[in-house]
Amino acid sequence: MLRFSFTLLLIAVTHPLFAQFTYAPINVPGATSTEARGINNNGEIVGFYVIAACVEQRQSMEVPTCPTHGFKLVNGRYIELMVPTSFRTAIMGVNDYGDLVGFYVTSELTCSSSVYHGFIWYHTNTVRKLDYPGTDVCPTSSSAAITVPFGINKAGTVVGGVWGIDPNGSSRSFPSRGWVWKSGTFSTMNPTLPGNPAGACCWSVTGISNTGVLAGLLFQSDFWQAWMKAGTDQDFFTYPTVNQCCDTTATGVNSAVDMIGFDGGPSSFSAGNGWFTKHIELNEVNDTEVKPSFIKMAYPGSTNIQPPGPLPTFPFGINDARGIVGTYIDTNNQQHGFLAKPNF
């Protein structure tokens, strides 16, 4: 269902000559906040926006709790997308065919609470409901398990997680498990560190490349950790930051195994230190895993606190040309989308 479209040219933000990325803002006209979540190899960008007075908190950036409307940005034109019968739609990813994934919220006569469903919105304009087993139920408690698809590749494989959420949408808790959906079947995806140490929990798959490489997060050894899985090879890593030790969220991966993410994790305060790392497999020495080399991502500008710091920046989607989309927070605590292109 296409509700409206606007044409808008992306204007690059002025940046220093030494900047690693050139940024352009993404703002849906009339919205109070905009988040860009996915980009495909054709340059189509998807995400969601809010028109109410609602701001996502930094400790809950992965899954939105505000009343969202989905959008697609194609050739400078914004198109609103709402799943039929829904009053909230969040688009989280897009593949090269233009198939979309995300979740929506609706009312059902047999349920007194709002009901959440994952979905695939095919480029043929057919919507398929996508619910991990056990999540397609009427919420009966203050925390319901919902299906959150984060990405889809050209083969039609979808990845995501099962997340706990307040049925009223006012708060969000940890993920419980990651999953991969292929040819109509869900498979659980919960990788653990070498040696399978005790205490692992709270998985989610957050990205998939056209070559089938997976990105995700888990909580283990006292920290949120990012991971990459390519076949039987698994890498686990954390991002260094001055504000906290090691909590790390990975949000996307492309066919070259370039990865993106930010510091922090679910219900863990994030300073908004975005990061990019080139082909993570090149970090291996004689098949021994080593810490990736990170390039910091920060939307141009600075905070108005003392001492001033970079604007909080959250990369969420990456394509094979290293085009990156995400969200930044301005000095008025408002969220905006962005498109970043590398200068290397």
PLM ranges: what are they?
Residues 7, 17-18:
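Cleavable N-terminal signal peptides
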Residues 1-6:
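Bacterial N-terminal signal peptides that target proteins for export
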Residues 19-344:
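Residue-level hotspots at or immediately adjacent to binding/recognition sites across diverse folds
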